[in-house]
């Protein structure tokens, strides 16, 4: 039966857990549309790097 050979100390456990964290998504202001969008992605209005790339899904 698989059993840990040694007890895992609090310090060792907590050092491992320091990397378990959330990171906020990078958001940039788009001057063309005046909206915020995530970097390296097409905005909701269909713009990427100031140019119209795709059709926007407009709500009716």
From Swiss-Prot:
Molecular function via GO: structural constituent of ribosome
GO CC terms in record: large ribosomal subunit
Top-rank lineage group of the source organism: Bacteria
A GO biological-process term: translation
Keyword Cell division recorded: no
UniProtKB keywords: Ribonucleoprotein, Ribosomal protein
UniProt-listed SUPFAM superfamilies: Zn-binding ribosomal proteins
Basic residues: bias regions: 7-20
Region feature (Disordered): 1-21
Family the UniProt entry places it in: Belongs to the bacterial ribosomal protein bL32 family.
Protein name: Large ribosomal subunit protein bL32
Organism: Streptococcus uberis (strain ATCC BAA-854 / 0140J)
Gene: rpmF
């Amino acid at each position: 039966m698989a059993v840990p050979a040694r007890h895992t100390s609090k310090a060792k456990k907590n050092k491992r857990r320091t990397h378990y964290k959330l990171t906020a998504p990078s958001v940039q202001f788009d001057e063309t549309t005046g909206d915020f969008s995530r970097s390296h992605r097409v905005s909701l209005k269909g713009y990427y790097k100031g140019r119209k790339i795709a059709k926007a899904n407009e709500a009716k």
